[in-house]
């Protein structure tokens, strides 16, 4: 209980990232967090999907654990070991089994984006805030 309170206090005083810097060819571009739909990790590489004019996917130099600590938890939720999503990214939610949810995300080729069993309750609370 005490560690949860301490974590909540440190979270309240922590400034969250406003942008991520990505490399595009030889160019470096700042991407505002407001343009990010979700983050995903595949084979130890972390990607950031945007929804701007030309929806693009960028490689970022952060692990999902680092991203989770750097972004506002009111805006993003870690649904599994592979995904951190924003509410804007979610097109559809389907009850996948008695204890899991399947999400359809905008600009996502993966049609099996599942909320882990351990996070379903917290995810539902996050949706309802």
Question: Each PLM stretch: what is its role?
Answer:
Residues 122-129:
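C-terminal output/interaction extensions
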């Amino acid at each position: 209980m005490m560690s949860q309170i301490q974590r909540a206090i440190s979270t309240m005083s922590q400034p969250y990232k406003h942008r991520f810097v990505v490399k595009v060819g030889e160019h470096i571009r700042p991407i505002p967090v407001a343009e990010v739909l979700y983050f995903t990790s595949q084979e130890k590489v972390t990607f950031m999907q945007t929804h701007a004019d030309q929806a693009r996917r960028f490689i970022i130099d952060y692990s999902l654990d680092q991203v989770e600590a750097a972004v506002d938890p009111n805006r993003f939720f870690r649904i599994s070991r592979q995904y951190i999503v924003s509410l804007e990214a979610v097109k559809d939610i389907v009850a996948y089994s008695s204890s899991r949810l399947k999400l359809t995300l905008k600009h996502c080729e993966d049609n099996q984006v599942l909320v882990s069993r351990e996070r379903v309750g917290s995810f539902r609370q996050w949706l309802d805030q």
